[in-house]
Amino acid sequence: MVSWIWRRLRGKKRSVMAFCLLMVLSAVAVIHFPPGHPASTPGLNPMEPRGEVGASDPRIQQTLNSSLRQPARNLGHWTGQALPRNPILVCAKKQSRRRQVDRSRHPLSVRRDAILSAQDRELLLEGEVRDAGGAALGQPGHNGLVQETQSKTVTMVVPLTERSHESFQAQRDTAAASFRPWPADGRDPLPGAKNGVLTGGKAGSATSGSEAPWWSSSAEDLQKSPWCGTETPGLAGTAAWGQVPPWFMEHDAQTLRLLVHGKVVGKARVPAHGQVLQVGLSAGDALQDISPLRLSQFCSQGLCGLIKRSKDLHEVLSFHLDRVLGLQRSLPAVARSFHSPLLPYRYTDGSVRPIIWWAPDVQHLRDPDEDQNSLALGWLQYQALLARGCKWPGQIPCLGIHHAEWARLALFDFLLQVHDRLDRYCCGFEPEPSDPCVEEGLREKCRNPEELRLVHILVRSSDPSRLVYIDNAGNLQHPEDKLNFRLLEGIDGFPESAVKVLASGCLQNLLFKSLQMDQVFWESQGGAAGLKHVLETLESRGQILLRHIKKHNLTLFRDKDP
């Protein structure tokens, strides 16, 4: 029996030896292979196993499916399933094969992560535009299609507001700081003021000055001021924006720097205004040719302007007149030559054009016939408001605009002879045959006052009790014997601060100094010699207005009066 067993074992000797050798090799493999892989993929913990090839963690799939709702993140955290704690020979072989596959897969996985991260950020950026641009969708130039798109995507961008908004906030603050003017000596031109947001707040604060006018003393004191002299030390001959006159608020200074130096990063047509182009402006080399949705976001943050025709250059002069008089109702405007490849050739042919700041919260009626107004107002209703205000309930609707606003508007329009707002039908003077009111047959409606409508009566949602002035080019060639006194009809008082400036005789010198801040406009008009006539015209009209006030014994009100 023993000899038979021995013969059987000798027959199996080779198999036993092979089995033993295999066991030794498996033991070596178990000892030398670690239970986890090194972190060859960025962001992977060295002790985190990868799992099976082609299998991803459910969290990764959730991230990919919700890329529009989640902030951009590192997609390199592929976690997989854990390996067994007590591997056997078969597991060791599978682990070795899996490691080889992982090595060959690593470059592709990094590339995939980079692509996914870039796509994720791009999608998030578009979602942010739709969300942040919502503030501007109610403004002119945004159609219902965009509004519908925004309404469909708002739920996708809610979770990312914190990080994405902070990113854009930083970009906006950087732009505002870059455009802030500083004097040559390094002093803050507006001591105690802080950088403001270009969208502004109330019309009586960041966007249109404080309640107190820049000059609250008497006309005689203004005459003694260095600003009324023929030259102001440190101002004449200096570079543009070297020193800021006191009638400009900090928001003005920031916005003017934006309009002068901002790089065009996008454009859009303004419906029903073929000669006007809306452009987005940015500091530095941030973006180029941004999408309409991104442009909407720029405009909602106060980083846009309207490029108008060269014939509208006097809107720049009108803006400076508004600030010198302390009215603070016109939107900032500068003259500029454009060279951006994003603009059509007619905008880059070297001609000087005005660019007006785009206020993001100007309200427009949805009625196509009244889209240039914030409220519908006829001439008879306007006269009733001037006569009785809101003291007679049930007689006329109260519009919520301060009574004194109409006096400021009338003074401004009379000096510039702007007819479009209060007398677009030219009922108060004899127009030229080439005037639009004649060419369009509007003057025939003067026979029926009930048909007369006011135009460009606009307010901002930030302060709907105050008017905002647009399209202020006016008519500085209008002869004195044809001045339109209908613009003053029904007005029983004027702002005291503006009347003081007119009575001081300093208007011409103040405007000279103010306009020197816009070197492009100054040079385009031929400097002091070229501007002398138009400034004398404004000075003369101011004296005529003073005589009108004295003749009719009209009152003066302080700027704080509603």
Curated annotation (Swiss-Prot):
Pfam families given in the database record: FAM198
Chain positions listed as propeptide in the UniProt record: 30-111, 424-562
Compartment(s) of residence: Secreted; Endoplasmic reticulum; Golgi apparatus; Membrane, Caveola
Region: Disordered, residue numbers: 179-229
Signal sequence region: 1-29
Keywords for this protein: Endoplasmic reticulum, Golgi apparatus, Membrane, Secreted, Signal
Keyword DNA repair: no
Keyword Membrane: yes
Tissues where this protein is expressed: Expressed in tracheal serous gland, heart, muscle, fat, lung, ovary, liver, kidney, adrenal gland and brain (at protein level).
Post-translational modification: Proteolytically cleaved. Cleaved at Arg-112 and Arg-424 leading to a processed mature product of 35 kDa. The cleavage takes place in the Golgi apparatus.
InterPro entries assigned to the protein according to its UniProt record, in alphabetical order: FAM198
CC annotations in GO: caveola; endoplasmic reticulum; extracellular region; Golgi apparatus
Positions marked as site (Cleavage): 111-112, 423-424
PANTHER family according to UniProt: GOLGI-ASSOCIATED KINASE 1A, GOLGI-ASSOCIATED KINASE 1B-RELATED
Record family assignment: Belongs to the GASK family.
Protein name: Golgi-associated kinase 1A
Organism: Mus musculus (Mouse)
